[in-house]
Amino acid sequence: LFYTSLSPNHLNVYIDVNHYYADKKRALFFIKNNEIYFINNLDNIIGIKDNQFEIKIDFIKEIKKYLQGEFSCKYANIAMNYCLNKGFSKEELLNRLITLKPVKYRLNKVFENKQFIFINDSKSTTSNSSKYCFETFSDRPRILILGGKHKSNKFNIKINDNDLVLIYGIDKNIINKEINGLLFNNLEEIMKYIKTLKNNYYVLFSPGCDSHDQYKSFIDRGNHFNELINIYFKYE
């Protein structure tokens, strides 16, 4: 099973959109049979050769015990139903769910106390992924942390009156023109500010930008976020 989105969110590493699509196409050369499925959106499953794919069982409720995020759960549901079509039993697949691990720093809940729930989404390098994170956690006020090297795609996120946007990094002024927030030089300044707040919040670290202005990678950035949680919140 091969599935991918065809949304050009990472054009900063490509010459243009045509090179982006060509790179996606090259992945097909690693498929060893002709049973290939493209998923460009969740309502449009395009099959090649074997066009009998169908969603037989909705595993979403079980999947949500192990994964965060609407699309992550729906993609996992599609993969599990593909396996059903290939002869795996429902019991086998449910047993495998126990071993399912989320992608590192993609919507990871890393700490919770009486006031804050911290979500580490450092893998977020586009405005679309920040928007997805923001909309995934919506049952309490949210603090959205953005920052880094801004890409060409603009931030188009609807912020409520009880939400906060905190922006840091080299392109904080550019980001602030697209989504108004409070400006900081670095992530540690933001964590110190959050420490002064009194209300209950989700703290969503979903930068929506490239990490290389202050970090080696999104993993380095995510590690630093966790370290700051330990320093300022975990041992209160």
Functional labels for PLM-detected ranges:
Residues P207-Y235:
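Glycine/aspartate-rich loop-and-adjacent alpha/beta segment that forms the canonical ThDP
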Residues L1, I45-K65, N162-V165, K177-I190:
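Active-site regions of enzymes building and remodeling cell-envelope glycoconjugates
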Residues P8-N9, L42-D43, T125, G148-K151, ...:
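Short glycine-rich anion-binding loops that position phosphate/pyrophosphate groups of nucleotides
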Residues I63-D163:
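Nucleotide phosphate-binding/pyrophosphate-handling subdomain across enzymes
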Residues F2, Y37-N41, I145-G147, D161-K172:
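Short internal beta-strands
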Residues L1-D50, I60-I63, D213-F218:
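Flexible active-site lid/hinge loop adjacent to a nucleotide/diphosphate
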Residues L1, Y20, Y75, A79, ...:
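Residue-level signal for inorganic ion chemistry
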